């Protein structure tokens, strides 16, 4: 039996929901929102976004629940279409997050919370990370409801808070406090979740590829703490915490440049699909030649950096704090370091190595540690994603991959739920898509949504509907 949701999909409604959600400044942390919110109330932004989604689903007769699992204003929303009759299979989850990172509004060409639609492009914070997917998953839920299709499993919509800061107020907290939200009436956790950071197209040479995320790196957010002797800036001495911190950060950068590569299976398969077998072959034995081969094959710098980061553990200093006054030698200083680990890396051993690298200049302290995760790339739902992409774009090639960021998939792994990154978008080769994540002038073409919405709906219908 063929299930066709296309007649029930509302692209205009999807775009409207995206624009409306962008106009809700659900910035994480909330206190980072006021200046950028252009007079709009920034408090409770995530709960406001959750209530918006709940109202859309409630209006269609879909049961919903808004939950503030830890703190007022840090809300998430769950919606559920129940199986028609007894569920024969565990649920499918449509997972997204409604929080967004802060903006530097002065660096934007348009109001980052305006949701402007200009020349077929929607602008605003969250347009690609990831309110576009929230809107598409809302549209799919509405289409399932309108169609009256019989479901063999529950379909759960989950748009959660706090993904951008580890999920304590969102997925992580909900998994711990309300695991039943991720399961059916028989207590079976979801068989799969469709999540972010995959599905989009990348162009390599003259070929177009569609990514399907089947793994993601681990996270160890780390603090460097340097201490010294405070004093007057006019009388320098050798125990300056600022100098120690700078030396520690410099040592980390030099160590990163020497860090060896390790090609994990998900990355080896991705490189093979892209025709970059030579990069995979050389990465572990001749890094200079591997780098040259990668540079020659991938001229686009952000994609090239992404692939390079797939090949090794990384430690990136991102935040520095030292000193409060120009004429005072700091007695302490801190740096924040974003450490990302490949599947199979011993995170404690890597931290020990980083401590050796910085030596006595600073103390290395882990703040948040989350493991790398991997899922089978031959799962039924991956096959459905591949089939739907090939049908929609016969000239494109699906490619399973590992991503370097982290997602709420790490929290759901505690329940045994595999999360596949699949927010399908067909993008022109000149769209700097990867650089728009957390970047200025975040935006998404409506044409990309027009491609992706029926592809996503096809996967959901084939996986969830009764045959």
Predicted segment positions?
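Acidic-enriched catalytic cores of C-N bond-cleaving enzymes acting on peptides and small amides
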Residues: 183-192, 198-207, 212-221, 233-320, ...
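Active-site-adjacent substrate-binding region
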Residues: 249-258, 278-282, 289, 376-426
